[in-house]
Amino acid sequence: MENRWQVLIVWQVDRMKIRTWNSLVKHHMHISRRANGWVYRHHYDSRHPKVSSEVHIPLGEARLIIKTYWGLQTGERDWHLGHGVSIEWRLRSYNTQVDPGLADHLIHMHYFDCFAESAIRKAILGYRVSPRCDYQAGHNKVGSLQYLALTALIKPKKAKPPLPSVSKLVEDKWNKPQKTRGRRGNHTMNGH
């Protein structure tokens, strides 16, 4: 019998990000109880030797599975030391890979209260509005002008520690272009 290959999208990440992600997931599962129903699986619960952990997030009938890997081939960067993350959406026998932004959006829609467009209508009608979203990573667009005005008027409290974000987990902060300030703002550019 011939070998059959299966292609899987794996986002290369720093191992410290994986450790942070796992500790945030465990904190919100066991201490804050905000990740209710989430299941964390250790590496010894998996049959695959390269899987270091799995997080199963129920989304109604479907579920999101975030797997972290170790011992992969190293990447082109120094910090690509063979660690990665795959994100899978599964419904019964159907499964597909999703990107981190969509994964965060799905988690946001299913689990967390949000200060959204409905809050603007409530504020106009005179109801008390709590201007905070528990899961900011689930927003992938800029809000309307009224939304921005309401958020500027009443500052939201930040939850500590933050909720685990898939986008933050796979974020490539090393390859982002550096932001340099002008001549006045950056002291190294003007010699002081």
UniProtKB/Swiss-Prot annotation:
Organism (species): Human immunodeficiency virus type 1 group M subtype C (isolate ETH2220)
Motif (HCCH motif) positions are: 108-139
Q: Where do the record's region annotations for RNA-binding lie?
A: 75-114
**Protein name (record):** Virion infectivity factor
Residue list for modification Phosphothreonine: 96, 188
**Subunit info?**
Homomultimer; in vitro and presumably in vivo. Interacts with viral RNA and Pr55Gag precursor; these interactions mediate Vif incorporation into the virion. Interacts with the viral reverse transcriptase. Forms cullin-5-RING E3 ubiquitin-protein ligase complex (ECS complex) by interacting with host CUL5, RBX2, elongin BC complex (ELOB and ELOC) and CBFB/CBF-beta. Within the ECS complex, Vif interacts directly with host CUL5, ELOC and APOBEC (APOBEC3F and APOBEC3G) substrates.
Gene label: vif
Q: What InterPro entries does the record point to?
A: Vif
Q: Positions of the region Interaction with host APOBEC3G?
A: 40-44
What note about domains is in the entry? The BC-like-box motif mediates the interaction with elongin BC complex.
The record's subcellular locations are: Host cytoplasm; Host cell membrane; Virion
Biased composition of type Basic residues is found at 176-186
Its organism's taxonomic lineage begins at: Viruses, Riboviria, Pararnavirae, Artverviricota, Revtraviricetes
